[in-house]
Amino acid sequence: MSRSARRKTSALNTVLRVVEVFASIQGEGPFTGTYSVFVRLAGCNLRCPFCDTRYAWSLEAGKPLGVEELVEEIARYEPSLVVITGGEPLLQRHPLNSLVEGLESLGLRVQLETNGILPAPARDEQLWRVYHVVSPKDVPVRVPGAKLHPSWVDYARATGRAWFKFLVANEQHVREVAEYVAKLGIPRSRVYIMPLTPEKLDMKELLELHSRIASLAVKWRLNFSPRLHLLVQLP
């Protein structure tokens, strides 16, 4: 590879297309309630009809930001956790590894949210060491084109740093999740079910939905994830 080509590759690996950076609490999954900085990356490989961040679907929706500049912006918030979300963050895999390296150099914990279509990190990637919350969309919501890459199950077993989170609306959905994780050999301790929230629910309806899904989690011996940020009206 020529010197100019190497410079070009290096530049690509240190620039991310970023939709937004903001502070909130992590409202979902194993780190619920943690003060966090969210980094929303542009681009997604799915078109989920229930998606509440459609503005991040296109790669062009993001502003190009250098990794060093982005790390400095994140550090100013002094977060307990950095949540990298999307879109689908792994579409920007190479610069994402550079971002993780920069964040870890500051001693920051990193959690990545993914739909699990793309392969799990390899051992030689910076991403191998971060926490992952995988939200498969092939069960029970069945989004076209969604299929969990089998490497995520192996990654979870090898590292203990991955959890699987499923959107559910009723008991049939929960039954499908239970059958799915049993077939793949995913321990229930690594599985969360979370309410699939339609648009325009008032607070009473939102609380009732959370109560129903939480009761189903107990019945089926699964972990329950609220959507805490919705309940407390944070971004």
From Swiss-Prot:
Give the matching InterPro entries.
7-CO-7-deazaguanine_synth-like, Aldolase_TIM, rSAM
Per UniProt, the cofactor note for this protein states: Binds 1 [4Fe-4S] cluster. The cluster is coordinated with 3 cysteines and an exchangeable S-adenosyl-L-methionine. Binds 1 S-adenosyl-L-methionine per subunit.
Which CDD domains does this one have?
A: Radical_SAM
Pathway connected to this protein: Purine metabolism; 7-cyano-7-deazaguanine biosynthesis
Annotated positions binding substrate:
I25, Q26, G27, R40, T85, P235
Q: Where does Mg(2+) bind?
A: T53
Record's subunit section: Homodimer.
What is the role of the protein in this entry? Catalyzes the complex heterocyclic radical-mediated conversion of 6-carboxy-5,6,7,8-tetrahydropterin (CPH4) to 7-carboxy-7-deazaguanine (CDG), a step common to the biosynthetic pathways of all 7-deazapurine-containing compounds.
What this protein is called in its record is 7-carboxy-7-deazaguanine synthase
Q: Which organism is it from?
A: Hyperthermus butylicus (strain DSM 5456 / JCM 9403 / PLM1-5)
> Mind giving the lineage of the organism this protein is from?
Archaea, Thermoproteota, Thermoprotei, Desulfurococcales, Pyrodictiaceae
